[in-house]
């Protein structure tokens, strides 16, 4: 019980909303020819770092790359958007990233110390009913040629939605990522499999390193027009405010965490005074995800200086006067 209590804050549910192609076929002549249909794709994931990296199975998210909303739910009820940043097909693993404070990364265990008969718990979000845990034992261990663990077999129930969740030992330490079941009926028959945490964590570190190297940072704001003397006078009653007017802020993004709000004006980023969108893009693209950035804003007649750590995403600002 103590092990479950310790590990449960680190296990999340994964929900995705995507385009539904079935809706086009069902549309009648008097309906819209195309509309959006929300569909939930459910799975689980494990928080493995306090800066927002989550491990899950690739098959949980491999059909979600074109979706318009991916979200994770924490054990405490908080929900936040997530970005799939990298994946490992060979080991059926994927890494997500979220921008959120006060995360509880799971303690990493040593699957090499596991023995057949050890008690284990599978924690996940089966069938959209919230987080649950199932008890089982290590049924079998398959080793590589160098005697390291390659797969853990367990009879702890891995039901639909549990994929990508945590297999923990009695101390609450992660020893595997729940991945699949063997079943002729499609239902759980007491034969489940987990990727050892040693393999999963090694893969995750390599994937994250490559993802950071390949991506520039992401602030998470949509800006409107660049302020001129005329628009500054209209919006703020004075003609000397220059910068980019913030129209919206990504939920869970770096800008949101910094406290940036719609209606703010971004006047300076790092040491660059902002006159148009390119000035913001230049500074963001010079930094990697996770790096700190200084943003100066104008709000309610005052100039504020905010700090935040950039996230993952495409650094692109919507501004009709600037082509990215």
Label for each model-derived stretch:
Residues 45-47, 82-84, 138, 246:
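Conserved hydrophobic positions within beta-strands
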Residues 22-38, 85-91, 140-152, 182-187, ...:
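Gly/Ser-enriched beta-turn/beta-hairpin loop segments
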Residues 38-39, 60-69, 103-105, 123-137, ...:
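Active-site loop architecture of trypsin-fold serine endopeptidases
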Residues 42-44, 68, 162-165, 244-246, ...:
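Short loop/turn microsegments at loop-to-beta-strand junctions
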Residues 2, 83-84, 97, 115, ...:
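C-terminal recognition in membrane/secretory proteostasis and scaffolding
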Residues 1-2, 21, 32-53, 79-81, ...:
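A conserved glycine-rich beta-strand in the N-terminal activation segment of trypsin-fold
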Residues 1-28, 34, 44, 53, ...:
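N-terminal activation segment of mature serine protease catalytic domains
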Residues 49-124, 128-132, 145-150, 160, ...:
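Conserved active-site neighborhood of the chymotrypsin/trypsin-like protease fold
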């Amino acid at each position: 019980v103590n092990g479950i209590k310790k590990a449960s804050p680190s296990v999340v549910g994964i929900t995705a909303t995507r385009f539904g192609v079935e809706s086009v076929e069902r549309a009648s002549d008097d309906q819209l020819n195309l509309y959006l249909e929300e569909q939930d794709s459910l799975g689980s994931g494990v928080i493995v770092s306090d800066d927002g990296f989550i491990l899950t199975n690739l098959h949980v998210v491999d059909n979600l790359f074109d979706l318009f909303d991916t979200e994770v739910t924490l054990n405490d009820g908080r929900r936040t958007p997530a970005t799939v940043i990298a994946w490992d097909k060979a080991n059926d693993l994927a890494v997500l990233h979220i921008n959120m404070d006060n995360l509880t990364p799971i303690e990493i265990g040593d699957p090499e110390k596991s023995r057949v008969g050890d008690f284990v718990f599978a924690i996940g979000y089966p069938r959209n009913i919230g987080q649950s845990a199932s008890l089982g034992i290590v049924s079998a261990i398959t080793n590589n040629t160098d005697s390291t663990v390659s797969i853990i077999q367990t009879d702890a129930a891995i039901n639909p939605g549990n994929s990508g969740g945590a297999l923990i030992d009695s101390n609450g330490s992660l020893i595997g990522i729940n991945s699949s079941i063997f079943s002729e009926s499609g239902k759980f028959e007491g034969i489940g499999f987990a990727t050892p945490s040693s393999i999963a964590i090694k893969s995750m570190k390599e994937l994250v390193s490559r993802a950071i190297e390949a991506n520039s940072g992401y602030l998470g704001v949509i800006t409107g027009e660049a302020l001129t003397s005329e628009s500054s006078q209209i919006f703020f009653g004075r003609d000397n405010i220059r910068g980019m007017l913030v129209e919206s802020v990504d939920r869970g993004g770096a800008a949101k965490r910094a406290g940036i709000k719609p209606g703010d004006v971004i006047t300076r980023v790092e040491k660059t005074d902002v006159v148009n969108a390119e000035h913001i893009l230049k500074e963001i693209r010079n930094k990697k995800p996770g790096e700190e950035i200084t943003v100066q804003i104008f709000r309610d007649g005052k100039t504020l200086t905010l700090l935040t750590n950039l996230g993952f995403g495409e650094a692109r600002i919507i501004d009709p006067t600037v082509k990215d």
